[in-house]
């Protein structure tokens, strides 16, 4: 049976998380769905997988709440269930930046659709002639799997380091059109809002992130694959599982070449961690 994998988020003010959390958990468990839903005062972030009918039924139920009526999840298919359990968690933020919380009622950051971004990249500038800077907001190990051509990345280990990195490089963004991007849109939206707040003049988020770009225009101007946070590890521009795997001892990304090493034992070790504390604890 084919499994439908969806991811979606929305920055929207939520003041009834104590009611939403058990209701969502009950609905998902009854439908046989697995994955994670994060709820915070600033919104919702979810990754779910299950049969088509179960996914569609849950989304119909979710859309009945006016706050979530416009959520359009990104989809991919797999032969296996990528998640082991169903979790619904209450958090301070749906994506941790450790900065003042996003205020959903004040609106989202400007966005650029994948087809429009491809046109900008094809022509070498935006529609007003400004150079376009692709700014990767993801962690360093994700960037290593693949990113846009000539993208700027700040070698951060976690998203909460992004504000400090932007502050150090803000002058380099002056006079340019900055397009922040990430896997599915949530980090680049929050990053774009933060950059606006600190005075970066012309900033957009890539609508739907890399996965939506793959879905709508393919891999043009992109090199490599896109890291995803489930057993598939990486998807290619056709949204198919790619070669890299993740070591579940140290969380490093293991390339197809590294998987040939005798040090690579699924779930136990890889060339990055063999003999380390991470490997010993696995």
Curated annotation (Swiss-Prot):
Keywords: Oxidoreductase, tRNA processing. The keyword Oxidoreductase applies. It catalyses: uridine(34) in tRNA + AH2 + O2 = 5-hydroxyuridine(34) in tRNA + A + H2O. Its EC number is 1.14.-.-. Gene3D superfamilies: 3.30.70.100, Rhodanese-like domain. GO terms for molecular function: oxidoreductase activity, acting on paired donors, with incorporation or reduction of molecular oxygen. PANTHER family: RHODANESE-LIKE DOMAIN-CONTAINING PROTEIN 7-RELATED, THIOSULFATE SULFURTRANSFERASE/RHODANESE-LIKE DOMAIN-CONTAINING PROTEIN 2. Catalyzes oxygen-dependent 5-hydroxyuridine (ho5U) modification at position 34 in tRNAs. This is tRNA uridine(34) hydroxylase. It comes from Cupriavidus necator (strain ATCC 17699 / DSM 428 / KCTC 22496 / NCIMB 10442 / H16 / Stanier 337).
């Amino acid at each position: 049976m084919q499994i439908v994998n969806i991811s979606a988020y929305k920055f929207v003010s939520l003041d009834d998380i104590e009611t939403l959390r058990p209701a969502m958990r009950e609905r998902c468990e009854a439908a046989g769905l697995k994955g994670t839903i994060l709820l915070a005062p600033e919104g919702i972030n979810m990754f779910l997988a299950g049969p088509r009918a179960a996914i569609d039924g849950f989304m119909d139920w979710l859309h009945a709440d006016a706050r979530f009526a416009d959520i359009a999840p990104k989809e991919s298919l797999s032969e296996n269930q990528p998640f082991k359990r169903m979790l619904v968690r209450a958090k301070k933020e749906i994506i941790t930046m450790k900065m003042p919380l996003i205020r959903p009622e004040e609106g989202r950051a400007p966005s650029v659709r994948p087809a429009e971004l491809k046109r900008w990249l094809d022509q070498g500038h935006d529609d007003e002639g400004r150079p376009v800077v692709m700014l990767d907001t993801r962690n360093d190990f994700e960037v290593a799997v693949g990113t846009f051509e000539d993208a700027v990345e700040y070698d951060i280990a976690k998203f909460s380091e992004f504000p400090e990195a932007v502050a150090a490089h803000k002058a380099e963004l002056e006079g340019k059109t900055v397009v922040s991007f990430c896997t599915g849109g949530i980090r680049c939206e929050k990053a774009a809002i933060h950059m606006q707040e600190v005075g970066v003049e012309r900033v957009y988020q890539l609508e739907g992130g890399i996965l939506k770009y793959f879905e709508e225009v393919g891999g043009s101007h992109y090199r490599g694959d896109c890291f995803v946070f489930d057993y598939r590890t990486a998807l290619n521009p056709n949204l198919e599982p790619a070669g890299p795997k993740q070591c579940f001892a140290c969380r490093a990304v293991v390339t197809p070449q590294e998987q040939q090493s005798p040090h690579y034992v699924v779930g136990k070790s890889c060339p990055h961690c063999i003999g380390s504390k991470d490997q010993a604890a696995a």
